[in-house]
UniProtKB/Swiss-Prot annotation:
Keywords: ATP-binding, Cell cycle, Developmental protein, Kinase, Nucleotide-binding, Selenium, Transferase. GO terms for cellular component: cytoplasm. SUPFAM superfamilies: PurM C-terminal domain-like, PurM N-terminal domain-like. This is Inactive selenide, water dikinase-like protein. One of its GO terms (biological process) is negative regulation of reactive oxygen species metabolic process. One of its GO terms (molecular function) is ATP binding. Expressed at low levels throughout the embryo. At later developmental stages, expressed in areas of high cell proliferation. From embryo stage 13, expression is high in central nervous system and midgut, especially in the gastric caeca. Expression also seen in larval imaginal disks and brain. Signal peptide: none annotated. Plays a role in apoptosis and consequently a role in imaginal disk patterning and growth. It comes from Drosophila melanogaster. Belongs to the selenophosphate synthase 1 family. Class II subfamily.
Amino acid sequence: MSYAADVLNSAHLELHGGGDAELRRPFDPTAHDLDASFRLTRFADLKGRGCKVPQDVLSKLVSALQQDYSAQDQEPQFLNVAIPRIGIGLDCSVIPLRHGGLCLVQTTDFFYPIVDDPYMMGKIACANVLSDLYAMGVTDCDNMLMLLAVSTKMTEKERDVVIPLIMRGFKDSALEAGTTVTGGQSVVNPWCTIGGVASTICQPNEYIVPDNAVVGDVLVLTKPLGTQVAVNAHQWIDQPERWNRIKLVVSEEDVRKAYHRAMNSMARLNRVAARLMHKYNAHGATDITGFGLLGHAQTLAAHQKKDVSFVIHNLPVIAKMAAVAKACGNMFQLLQGHSAETSGGLLICLPREQAAAYCKDIEKQEGYQAWIIGIVEKGNKTARIIDKPRVIEVPAKD
């Protein structure tokens, strides 16, 4: 049997049963008869959301895909309510169906390994795909597909251990989200990639069009920043040349705590955050991923109906990662809002009078904080971070 055929066989077994049930212990390569030096993150030259094409370049590349919907006579309507068509530029596509009152909400995403635990990598990949639906206030996903490229640099033993673990993590996260993985595509490739497609059919009242921010709203962020810094710092523990750059500002214990905080944050679904958007009358949201906090805030601001701008004053950051970022010079640009995040939190425009209750509710339901980080003011549809933002150190959870 060929290597590619083996991959497909492993995929079928994992998605339809036959995998090892004892998968929730922290990944130890030696426990699976792999070399102690095995690192999943070595099977790609880029890390996580570092695979993103720069935002300005991407806008030019996809311009040919844009459609002129203004040429249509009118938007589809249901019960005398216009159903918007949302395409390139936001988190999901929202396409009115020919069946009255229903829309297809769909998104796709993939990236390279960012952590070395294959099971957690699968969970993070699934959470990252679903996050685009959650950013639209959609809380129920009807179906998922998995997209997986197995590195040709893996030995058969490495492949047979790692790939089922990734798939199990992806599948378990989908089950946690109340959906299932019904198929996908598995290929071989020089670099390992993991991702998927999330689709749902819903009525207009089940999603929140992200264009209704008004002056006086506040900006809420539901996960801390600094995931990219944390995973890089963790890898540098074994790289003396890089570790020497940061060891004066952070200890190994600090880095390991930050890494586990980042890993758990990335694997956590934004589903509760999305559900509460409806309860507290959110005016729009986006999720923070590869373009960083400021990049995604600028995209969201640019799509608002009213002449508003976003001003960010506070930056919740995984503990000690702001110091690490500063020690690395301009490498991450974390405090400037340009550091990539993977499966980050939702950035939500909420009425000022309801934002505190939203934050309190999310902490009550999930045990995690959310933060008011900025305001919506009159402006020209831009976003900025003030010169000296307040950094909120977010400690690891016990």
